[in-house]
Structure formats: structure tokens, C-alpha cells
Amino acid sequence: MADHATLIDEANLETAAPGPAALETASAPLVRGKWLKNDMPRERLIEQGASVLSDTELIVLILGSGLPGHDVFDVARTLLDRFGSLRAMLDATYTDFADLRGIGPAKKTQLLAIMEMARRSLVDKMRMRSLINSPEAVENYLRLRIGGRPQEIFVSLFLDARHRLIRCEESAQGTLTRMAVYPREIVRRALSLNAASLIVAHNHPSGAVQPSASDCRLTHTLRDALTLIDVQLVDHLVIGTDSVYSFARAGWP
């Protein structure tokens, strides 16, 4: 079993241009002072459901109002422009909101609390089901957890004998294009958690999901190392902006 780190390097991949900032998805106009009652976000949510609202409108309902002199819709748009998407906002910390004008500490912490609730609800759902039979749930969770991160993150999902989640951990962090992953440490962690199987994943901040040569080397090294302790590597997922690459579905190239 090798001691050295496997370096994941995305630099040799063709990078995709970052997607545009989140756009309005609902048809109602967001023009200050020109709202009809039936176009108000709160009324539309009550009458039609939350799914009809745009990302901006959802944030507006959470914020309620801006500070004096700051329109709440402008604040919501600024948030989306800064992070690019609601998904990317899930990874925000209080520091990321520190210089944001228009909302105070109470609203900033409220936003962070709601985002954390979304993450935890996904983890709870995964703990109650066999992840072997729920690949979509795993991919959705990983998109939310690491899909919008500006640096490469390597995540390990340790599973029990019934393929239920024991723990999800960030095993390594890197830069925009590379990171060092130590297979030996992941194997040790699998042993300490008495895991029967494992799903690993990492993101490509460029948005492209095609695995690099180093991604393939790491996958084979980790798979061989886990086989020695009778732990199955179920899959290695590469998380991009809008898609996911599965080594298992691709036949473990």
C-alpha cells in the first residue's frame, strides 16, 4: 500500500467557462414599486407553491426587508451575483457575508442557518436508505456540498454493510486545479469506522467532469488498497457544474 499522496491535477483538462450568474426563472417582473398583489412573492407562494418563485424571490422572502436605504431585491440580486447560484451559497460562511451591505448580522445568520438545514436534511435522507440503490440522492448531496466550491475538495462517504451512510468526511482540500490525496489515510479511516464500503468524490472547480490521468491513477490505487482490507469502493464521482462523472458507470477506466 503506497504511503505517498496521489496528486489530482485538473490543469491538463479543457476547462469550461463558468456559467452565468443565476437568472430569474419566474415570469413575474421584479420592478420596485410596480408589484401587483398577485405578483407579490409571498402571495404567489401561498397560491401557487414555492417552486414558481425565482431564486431572487426566495431570498427576498427569507430576508423580509433590507436595512434602511437598501432595497431587499437589490440585496438578493447582489447575493446571487456574488455566489453565482443558490448551490454555491450553501458553502458560504459568515465571513463571506461580512462586507455585504443591506442586511444585518441577524439576517446573515438566518441565511446560514437555513443553508445548513438544507445540507443536514440531505444527509438525514441518505442515512435512512441504501446508497447503492440511491445514486441520485448521493449525487444531489455532493453537488450541494462541493459542486460550487472554489477549490478542489475530496469527500469520502463511509457505508455500513447495508450500504447506509456512517459518516461523510472531507478527506482532502486543494487549490483550484490540484490536491494531494493520501489513500492510506482513507483506508485507515475506513477501518476505524468499521466501514464495509466507500463512495469517494471530488469536484472540478472548472466545471468540467472529464477525469484527468491523476484521477484515474488515484481511483485504481484506492480501489486496490481497499480490496486488501475487504472494503468495496462503490464509486468515485467527479462533480462538475451541471453534471457528474461516475467511474463505476463508465466501467472503471
Curated annotation (Swiss-Prot):
One Pfam short name: UPF0758_N
Superkingdom of source: Bacteria
CDD domains noted in UniProt: MPN_DUF2466 (cd08071)
Domain spans labelled MPN: 131-253
GO terms of molecular function: metal ion binding; metallopeptidase activity
Residues at which Zn(2+) binds: 202, 204, 215
GO terms for biological process, alphabetical: proteolysis
Motif JAMM motif per UniProt: ranges: 202-215
Keywords: Hydrolase, Metal-binding, Metalloprotease, Protease, Zinc
InterPro entries: MPN, RadC_JAB, RuvA_2-like, UPF0758, UPF0758_CS, UPF0758_N
Family from the record: Belongs to the UPF0758 family.
Listed NCBIfam families: PRK00024.1, radc
Protein name: UPF0758 protein Bxeno_A3578
Organism the protein comes from: Paraburkholderia xenovorans (strain LB400)
